[in-house]
Amino acid sequence: KMDWTIEKAVELGVSHIVPLLSARSVVKLDGARAEKRVQHWQRLVVAAAMQCGRSRLPEIAPIQPVGTWLASLPAPQTHEQRWVLSPLAESSLMAQARALAAQAGAPPAEDHQNPPGDAVASKAGATTAWLLCGPESGLAETEVDQALSLGWQPALLGPRVLRTETAGLVGLTVLQAALGDLG
């Protein structure tokens, strides 16, 4: 599943992929197995980038626990927006991304006529959009709480329950459509 997700994320234009271990993760990789898996994913990144004509390769970070990764991040900058997918969120990722674009004075997403290669969120004044998606059973409440305490915004994808590989890619696509990189 992760192979497919990485391949499609590369095609969608992500710049960083951070494989995370959640309290609810089914697969637990560590040590040499984790290193081998990251090397495998790096080969997938190269192949996917070649396939879709990308000149910049996304970075694959080492596998790490969600809490460790969140704690290691610097505070959000003005040019960043961070979302955590949560079924308990009160508003959708699309609504939040569109509101961000509107605040920055960007035209509605359906009006965008972007040349190829525009960065996600470029019309909204943000140069970096982060999306945190949990495993099949979702992030643990403590993991979501940690993200929220660090400035992440909770977001829904809609009324459906999606598989993790689908949720991440739908989230990326929603951000691209709302912020002007797709369409």
Show which residues each predicted segment covers.
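Residue-level preference for the first positions of well-ordered beta-strands
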Residues: Q81-R82, A126-W130
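Intrinsically disordered, low-complexity terminal tails and inter-domain linkers enriched
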Residues: A75-Q77, S92-T127
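A C-terminal functional module that forms or caps the active site or interfaces directly
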Residues: T128-Q146
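Structured adenosyl-cofactor binding patch, chiefly the S-adenosyl-L-methionine
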Residues: A140-G183
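Short amphipathic alpha-helical segments
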Residues: G31, Q96-R98, E143-D145
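RNA substrate-binding interface of SAM-dependent RNA methyltransferases
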Residues: K1-V84
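Generic structural signal for helix capping and beta-alpha/helix-loop junctions
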Residues: V26-V27, S92, T164
